[in-house]
Design a protein with these regions (language model features):
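Hydrophobic faces of well-ordered beta-strands that scaffold small-molecule active sites
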Residues: 5-11, 34-36, 57, 65-69, ...
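Active-site-proximal loop/turn and secondary-structure-junction residues that shape catalytic pockets
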Residues: 11-13, 38-40, 71-73, 93-97
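A short alpha/beta connector and helix-capping loop motif
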Residues: 42-74, 78
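Conserved, mostly hydrophobic/aromatic
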Residues: 19, 26, 37, 57, ...
Length: 138
């Protein structure tokens, strides 16, 4: 099966002082969608973009916005990112599990879990789709 290669450009690589022109430049280069890493400083050590930035990007492109929620309690963010204009919402499976005892100390990354709350995960995937968005688990 020969699927075409798709390019997803990371917004984190952009010059945020020129975000609209960076989006245009990426579109002109032929990207297929924009990838937006959302980090909360808990699930992973970095803090990045929230729904306000996604909402600010949305008017500048018709290309899909793919948000990758690397956050604790991803269910708290689904509605906000859907409303902001995300087309694809990716959630981390580890966000639906209890952190292993050995990883509980602050600063222990990556998050490792023993089990996943599959019912909650399925419920949130359905919620994403009910917003008319594509849902992915990573």
């Amino acid at each position: 099966m020969n699927k075409p290669i798709e390019v997803s450009a990371s917004i984190l690589c952009a010059d945020f002082s020129k975000l609209a022109s960076e989006i245009k430049r990426s579109e002109d280069a032929g990207v297929d969608r924009f990838h937006i890493d959302v980090m909360d400083g808990h699930f992973v050590p970095n803090i990045t973009i929230g729904p306000v930035i996604v909402g600010a990007i949305r008017p500048h492109t018709k290309l899909p916005l793919e948000t990758h929620l690397m956050v604790e309690h991803p269910w708290d963010y689904i509605d906000a990112f859907a409303a902001a204009g995300a087309d694809i919402i990716q959630i981390q499976a580890e966000g639906y599990g209890e952190r292993r005892e050995a990883c509980r100390a602050y600063g222990q990354y990556p998050k490792e879990v023993d089990s996943i709350d599959e019912a909650r995960l399925r419920k949130d995937l359905l919620r994403i789709r009910q917003h008319g968005k594509k849902a992915n688990v990573v």
